[in-house]
Amino acid sequence: MEQREDHTKSSEPAFIPSKRTHQMRNIWAWGGPSSTTVNGSSDAVLFSSSLPSVLQFGKLPGKEREYNAQPKDDMFPMMKQPGTNARVADPMDDVAQHLIGNLLPDDEELLAGVIEDFDHVKLRTQVEESEEYDVFRNSGGMELDIDPLESITFGTAKASLVNGTGSSTNQYSIQNGAGTVTGEHPYGEHPSRTLFVRNINSNVEDSELRSLFEPFGDIRSMYTATKHRGFVMISYYDIRHARNAKTALQSKPLRRRKLDIHYSIPKENPSDKDMNQGTLVIFNLEPAVSNEELLQIFGAFGEVREIRETPHKRHHRFIEFYDVRAAESALRSLNKSDIAGKRVKLEPSRPGGARRSFIQHFNHEFEQDETKHNSFQIGSPSANSPPSLWSQLGSPTDENKLNALNETAFNGGMSPLGSNHLSGFSSGYPPMKSPVGKSSYWNNRADNIFHGSPTLHNSHSFPEHHGGIISASPLVSSAASSASTASGFTALTGTSFLWGNNNNLRDHGQPSSIQSQALSNSLFPNNQPQRQSNLYQNLRGSFGASEHFSQFNVGSAPSVFPFESNFGYFSDSPDTSYMRQGKFGGTGPTRVSGSLMTNFGAYPRINVASMQNGSVGFEGLLDRGRNQTVGNSGCQEDSRVQYQLDLEKIIAGKDTRTTLMIKNIPNKYTSNMLLEVIDETHEGTYDFFYLPIDFKNKCNVGYAFINMASPGYIVSFFKAFAGRKWEKFNSEKVVSLAYARIQGKAALVNHFQNSSLMNEDKRCRPMLFDPKHTENNNQILLNGIFISMAQQDATQERHDLPENPREDNFS
């Protein structure tokens, strides 16, 4: 017995006390302290709380308590005893394991108690809530892994459920504090010049990527160091090129992988020199300076995408260009220049800065209307998203009666007025106040337009929901687009200001004079309050005005994509008004100021005369909008028709336009090179020439403008150059000719005389010529600017426009 007692002491385990000490002590008390018991207790410990109370546990002897109280270095000291090669079997081990196995509850008994403790009603509710929360995943979306580099891909966004169901567009859930980002949610991805391309094969070559993305436009940079991680960054100069590339290449297979492309949002604190967004901020601007005047000044550097203001700060303006190179050129030329007697300061806008401030400002308002704004998304509008919400047509600082009208007259339903979507076109930016002469008349008279107008006597139904399709009255669209210019001008926000009016399809049907007069009198009575601008006059009577095909607008012919043109210029009388069709078939009155045309064609087109003929289903309007997409060849063709040269009409004298746009010019050509080519056959037939220059890259932008002295010269000019291949630089480009939007020498001079191009190198300025070969150079003074009438003789001597003698203009 003494030997066994000694052996027992040597085999007792020593361990550090822990919270499991009590459980282990109970097992040892039953089976006796042994190493086997300790090893076999792991299974029993899991169910120690389930052991019945019939087990009579004793107290450990005093020496065992000493072992428990004093920590040792080893759990099994017996294993270290010299000469011990095997464990000593304890006859009590088998007895302990057998009894414990019989006393433990079986599976049914164990799970029965667990199931009885559940509240089935609460469990079902939790499951339903979980399913609703997971609606994004159920709708076919995906979750993106958290990656610090990927956080720059998404802007701050807020998730929303559309009427309790998931949107059909892709949803992206991120966990960086920005919430859930919807692919085309108003708070989702904002159009950017940088594309974040995922799912890239690591073996793809850089040249292969460049050849894939470069056809859509000039690539600014390519970041391919992360190909091994499955993504790259492609940056364009022009945001339209990025948009077109994203639309065309989305899900395109590349080495058996479908590309996943998103817009990339710049970092929160970019460098002051980061011009990725192409937006400039003007400080200390005279509030009286209109957006039209700013457009004339900044439009000389490139196409302007948007001009917007900040609330309560009329002396600040944001000028956003499509092309960042134009923004850089404008910054260099106009910074610290004098505009309207004040020295202004230009700075690059912090990417998304103004946008974020408006998001915060309208956060609460958009939360309330979010379901309504998103319940009518159709298709994938990524290529057509304008940078402004369509639902906010007024100023953020003014009382917006338009939204109230949408909620009251239409009972909170979707309408062509309050809708922020037309056939799947979603929005990226919040509404930016952009008053091109903001009229207050709409705020006072909006309700009267749709309530009891004597001339609009036929019954027109308000929108009704039918299985997700909305019917609407044509009266609403036409009257709304007409009323938007009640006092002759209004704020151009949303698509009207950003995309302008496309002029590509005209409304030839004109109402009778009686109908026109009655309609204008009912909408715009004589006692209406007016706030006239010095650039505008009353619009009353403009509905009956005829279109003048002799004057076509904007400084360049339209691009292939119909959404790229913004503003129009022309040199006709300021009293001329137009009813034109917008890019989506929208009709809106157009007011003209000097050489500037602004338009309001944001709504589906309805002939003014046809407003008396009853309602038209909204499905037709949707079809019209869907038909005018980027990929629609018919729309592309229509956008070119009005600028195409028709030699038969020119010969017959029906088309008297004289200003041409020469396209597809190799970038290395200079003005002198181009003029030498022209003078080979047409010396002395033109009086204006201008080759726009990219000042950053020191090359031309690929097109030029020339004004022929007579329309008759266009026929021979077309025959000599159209389709001709350029001889120098081994270029594969061929000459393409089209009419320019600014027509006539006088309009061109008026457009460029106050341009900042006067501060650029003389070789980059527009040039005037005297086609009559006068012996001496003539100079004319226009608004304090001398313009040289260059001699055109056998020596080919030409003079650029001289520097501006008034140093206080743009110095």
Curated annotation (Swiss-Prot):
CDD domains: RRM1_MEI2_like, RRM2_MEI2_like, RRM3_MEI2_like. Pfam families: RRM_1 (PF00076), RRM_2 (PF04059). GO terms for biological process: positive regulation of meiotic nuclear division. Residues 374-397 have a biased composition (Polar residues). Transmembrane segments: none annotated. The gene is ML5. It comes from Oryza sativa subsp. japonica (Rice). Residues 371-397 are annotated as: Disordered. It comes from the Eukaryota. The keyword Repeat applies. This is Protein MEI2-like 5. SMART domains: RRM. Keywords: Repeat, RNA-binding. Residues 193-266, 278-351 form the RRM domain. PROSITE patterns: RRM. GO terms for molecular function: RNA binding. InterPro entries: MEI2-like_RRM1 (IPR034453), MEI2-like_RRM3 (IPR034454), Mei2-like_Rrm_C (IPR007201), Nucleotide-bd_a/b_plait_sf (IPR012677), RBD_domain_sf (IPR035979), RRM_dom (IPR000504). The keyword Repeat applies. Probable RNA-binding protein that may play a role in growth regulation.
